């Protein structure tokens, strides 16, 4: 296995092409197709999709009934088949072909010097500017063979073209109007196993039609859990009564991977790498997809499968798709604003319902001046405001221990006072010393032993105090630990920060919490004074503050469990898709190896934009795998209630992640050893 090969990780490079049409000149059009096919070959593309009636042109109307044109189409088609024998891509080319007593609007599927099959257009429009049935026959229900170049090849709308050496690549083809009907052929094909859906389109442009196409293609890719490759006719088509924009686009499960400039001068291609393993994973998890297949089994089981050997390149061809560094945090500013609005209000509404159900208890929260407790506090404040409850019913406690820094403690105090909540400070130092002495810990006799017991005595006492205060004052303990910490087991179990009465942060990863706080600042919800404190919190190193300063420069969470940016990246791929470690490493390398490439979320400081080598990615992935699969599940199995927030998933044992607490991570670690280079 070549780790750097996209094809080895289930990607398929596809191209949606629009060329310069020479109407009524099939030889010229075939030559244009061949030029673009060679360019796609050089790009390492496995598929090249061309517009409807590629070889004749779409806009030639009754000329389609002329024998000379049809003869020239067949000759040009055979030349194209022969000339493309040494090319990698599967070519999907439009052609009017004679069959029985009619002409059919077809897509001819060509690979390595052979015609794999011919797909007729199912639905021919005869409304508004369209009059296709005047010249051609509808292909819905057609199943059989057609004679091309002296050979019988498969003909019908029931064809799936499957790469025998790339199991995730199964192609189905439909033509233009087929996408616009309520039950398109591609939907049946997806249920039958197609992962890549191609559409050859004529589709003249009018105001608003491009957006209609985008909506339909996006919807098809999302509903079918598939890729949708769309290519429309452009320059060179007749403008006697119509115009053409040459729109090409590639969608994958509702996400736009590539789109070309419309109204191009000359040829254009949209090229992207489709993740067939992602599509397979989504279908595997969404059981109703296969339930739908069973319901339509008479249709789906009648599809014919045509196998071919793709023989894709084994080397590094790069990766032609955006891999988000922060899959929980979109880089698009508008989408990030929307996500932050939704995440924040999911948390707030979740807490509101719990408070209503308990007849409005006080909210008891430990505040440290760190990200998580800061965000939980502002969520609680907003919930109280919405419910018309006094902010003084929030009881915020600073619980300094042996290593609490003045900066973080001051941030906690300033924030609590600026918000107008009830604030108190309880120094746990004396109680912690007593406990350490009682259990005979070396620290109690002056030894500088800062082990896990030393840390957990402090973490446990903080939680113990909060629960007893909640008992005393009629409150509930609000948890602050986030999704990233739950994934890594970076919490103290039981009587510790793992436990609470309700946790608003349980579904929010660390990387998103930072942006939620930025969003709250920019929204100005709590005023300028609160915003200044929140910014100070954002500027502070993430630390548990459990080991005394001076022994280490600063106790860093990320030095122990890894950069949260990388670990959140791995968590998303594992939780949402169940990807292998080798694929996660491949994606992480493309996302993180160059800080100058790709997009960063808005507001992300330039001075804090890291890059990671493959060796670093591999090391922290090993840490993630060990902690996630083997070490930390017992903490998640006893997780308090809290709302799911992200589409990436949550870790509640009652929801997205149900796993045994006593499992080994060996198979994942072995796969890293075998398949991820050491850098």
Swiss-Prot record:
The active site is at 52 (proton acceptor), 121 (for glutaminase activity), 176 (nucleophile). CDD domains: GAT_Gln-NAD-synth, NAD_synthase. GO terms for biological process: NAD biosynthetic process. Changing residue 656 to A: Causes a decrease in ammonia channel efficiency to 70% compared with wild-type enzyme. ATP binds at residues 366-373, 480. It catalyses: deamido-NAD(+) + L-glutamine + ATP + H2O = L-glutamate + AMP + diphosphate + NAD(+) + H(+). Deamido-NAD(+) binds at residues 354, 456, 471, 475, 485, 490-493, 501, 635, 661. Its EC number is 6.3.5.1. Keywords: ATP-binding, Ligase, NAD, Nucleotide-binding. It holds the Pfam family CN_hydrolase. Residues 12-276 form the CN hydrolase domain. GO terms for molecular function: ATP binding; glutaminase activity; identical protein binding; NAD+ synthase (glutamine-hydrolyzing) activity; NAD+ synthase activity. The formation of the intermediates complex at the synthetase domain stimulates the glutaminase activity. Homooctamer; composed of two stacked homotetramers that form a ring-like structure. HAMAP family: NadE_glutamine_dep. PANTHER family: GLUTAMINE-DEPENDENT NAD(+) SYNTHETASE, NH 3 /GLUTAMINE-DEPENDENT NAD + SYNTHETASE. This is Glutamine-dependent NAD(+) synthetase. It comes from Mycobacterium tuberculosis (strain ATCC 25618 / H37Rv). The lineage of its organism: Bacteria, Bacillati, Actinomycetota, Actinomycetes, Mycobacteriales.
């Amino acid at each position: 296995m070549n780790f750097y090969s996209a094809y080895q990780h289930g990607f398929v490079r596809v191209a949606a092409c629009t060329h310069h049409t020479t109407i009524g000149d099939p030889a010229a059009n075939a030559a244009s197709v061949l030029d673009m096919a060679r360019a796609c070959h050089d790009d390492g593309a496995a598929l090249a999709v061309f517009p409807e009636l590629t070889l004749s042109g779409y806009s030639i109307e009754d000329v389609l009934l002329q024998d000379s044109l049809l003869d020239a189409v067949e000759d040009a088609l055979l030349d194209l088949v022969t000339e493309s024998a040494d090319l990698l891509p599967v070519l999907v080319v439009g052609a009017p072909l004679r069959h029985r007593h009619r002409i059919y609007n077809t897509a001819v599927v060509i690979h390595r010097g052979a015609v794999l099959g011919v797909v007729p257009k199912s639905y021919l429009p005869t409304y508004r500017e369209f009059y296709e049935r005047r010249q051609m026959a509808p292909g819905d229900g057609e199943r059989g063979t057609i004679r091309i170049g002296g050979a019988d090849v498969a003909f019908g709308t029931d064809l799936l073209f499957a790469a025998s050496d790339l199991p995730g690549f199964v192609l189905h083809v439909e033509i233009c109007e087929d996408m616009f009907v309520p039950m398109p052929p591609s939907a049946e094909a997806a249920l039958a196993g197609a992962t890549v859906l191609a559409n050859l389109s004529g589709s003249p442009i009018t105001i608003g039609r491009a957006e209609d196409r985008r909506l339909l293609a996006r919807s098809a890719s999302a509903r079918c859990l598939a890729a949708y490759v769309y290519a429309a006719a452009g320059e060179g088509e007749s403008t006697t009564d119509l115009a053409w924009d040459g729109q090409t686009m590639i969608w994958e499960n509702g996400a736009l991977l590539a789109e070309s400039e419309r109204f191009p001068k000359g040829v254009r291609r949209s090229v992207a790498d489709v993740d067939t393993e992602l599509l397979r994973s989504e279908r595997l998890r969404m059981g109703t997809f296969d339930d739908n297949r069973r319901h339509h089994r008479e249709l789906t089981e009648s599809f014919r499968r045509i196998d071919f050997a793709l023989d894709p390149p084994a080397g590094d061809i790069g990766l032609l798709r955006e891999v988000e560094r922060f899959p929980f945090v979109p880089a698009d500013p508008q989408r990030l604003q929307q996500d932050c609005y939704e995440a924040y209000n999911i948390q707030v509404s979740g807490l509101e319902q719990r408070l209503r159900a308990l007849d409005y208890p006080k909210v008891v929260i430990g505040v440290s001046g760190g990200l998580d407790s800061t965000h939980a506090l502002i969520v609680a404040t907003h919930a109280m405001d919405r419910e018309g409850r006094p902010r003084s019913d929030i009881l915020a406690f600073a619980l300094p221990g042996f290593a609490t820094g003045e900066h973080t403690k001051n941030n906690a105090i300033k924030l609590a006072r600026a918000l107008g909540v009830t604030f108190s400070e309880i120094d746990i130092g004396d109680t912690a010393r007593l406990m350490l002495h009682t259990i005979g810990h070396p620290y109690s006799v002056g030894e500088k032993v800062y082990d896990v017991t030393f840390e957990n005595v402090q973490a446990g006492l903080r939680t113990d105090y909060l629960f007893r205060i909640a008992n005393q004052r009629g409150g509930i303990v609000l948890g602050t630990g986030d999704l990233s910490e739950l994934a890594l087991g970076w919490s103290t179990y039981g009587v510790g920060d793992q436990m609470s009465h309700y946790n608003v942060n349980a579904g929010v990863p660390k990387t998103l919490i930072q942006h939620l706080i930025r969003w709250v600042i920019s929204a100005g919800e709590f005023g300028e004074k609160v915003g200044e404190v929140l910014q100070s919190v954002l500027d502070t190193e993430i630390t548990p503050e459990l080991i005394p300063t001076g022994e280490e420069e600063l106790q860093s969470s990320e030095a122990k469990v890894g950069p949260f940016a990388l670990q959140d990246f791995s968590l998303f791929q594992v939780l949402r898709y169940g990807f292998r470690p080798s694929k996660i490493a491949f994606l992480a390398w493309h996302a993180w190896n160059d800080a100058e490439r790709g997009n960063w979320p808005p507001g992300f400081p330039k001075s804090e934009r890291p890059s990671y080598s493959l060796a670093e990615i591999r090391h922290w992935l090993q840490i993630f795998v060990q902690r996630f699969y083997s070490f930390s599940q017992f903490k998640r199995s006893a997780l308090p209630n809290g709302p799911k927030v992200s589409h990436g998933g949550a870790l509640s044992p009652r929801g997205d992640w149900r796993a045994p607490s006593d499992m080994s991570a060996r198979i994942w670690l072995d796969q890293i050893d075998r398949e991820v280079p050491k850098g």
